[in-house]
UniProtKB/Swiss-Prot annotation:
Cytoplasmic face of the membrane: 27-35, 94-96, 152-154, 224-247
GO biological process: one example: phototransduction
Complex formation: Interacts with HTR-I.
Signal among keywords: no
Recorded GO MF terms: monoatomic ion channel activity; photoreceptor activity
Summary of the function given for this chain in its UniProt record: Involved in the control of phototaxis. Mediates both photoattractant (in the orange light) and photophobic (in the near UV light) responses. The signal is then transmitted to the sensory rhodopsin I transducer (HTR-I).
Modified residues (N6-(retinylidene)lysine): 206
Predominant place of localization: membrane
Domain of life: Archaea
Protein name from the UniProt record: Sensory rhodopsin-1
Protein family membership: Belongs to the archaeal/bacterial/fungal opsin family.
Provenance organism: Halobacterium sp. (strain SG1)
Amino acid sequence: MTGAVSAAYWIAAVAFLVGLGITAALYAKLGESEDRGRLAALAVIPGFAGLAYAGMALGIGTVTVNGAELVGLRYVDWIVTTPLLVGFIGYVAGASRRAIAGVMLADALMIAFGAGAVVTGGTLKWVLFGVSSIFHVTLFAYLYVVFPRAVPDDPMQRGLFSLLKNHVGLLWLAYPFVWLMGPAGIGFTTGVGAALTYAFLDVLAKVPYVYFFYARRQAFTDVVSAATADREDATDAVGDGAPTAAD
């Protein structure tokens, strides 16, 4: 590992610490929102990624298999955090649990077969890459076909869904290209170049992602405010209609 790669990994770890702080602020701001408990799981995304990058900076989990270097913690990070990224998009869309589980599974299998393609060679490498690509396309079908059908007619919720979907969608187009151009693929770029690009993409994918939830938290708090207002209106109506001694 070069000094540049090690430094990039440490910078990424610090950036994810910032992301963890953002999720803590979001949790505090949500107050009585019924989404508060579920959205607390967002902390896993920057938290786990930060630990993984700290480990990568220390050289933990990097192994050589069949002459190919596999940065194990990178793939462990991806297989834990990226299903959460796409799963929460489905949650914001109001998709069914089955659909959310489907997109998370497609994402995890995409990563798993991609890791398999790194440590194999010849025809098998490209077969595994092809299978990974199929799950990649399946993931996009969920994001751009299945989930939009479930989004309620609420401007804030629809806006947050669109933002998250396009943010992740655009970045997910870059990852297979970097893999293909790097040592695991056709070897057009060096391992250092691929490592630096992956670190940049990971930070760009995850830290702004949790910030978007914080910046648009009204999509969740307004639901609570509306419900509270309805209860207060109902209470007032009962009070106004109740008989008094004068009656």
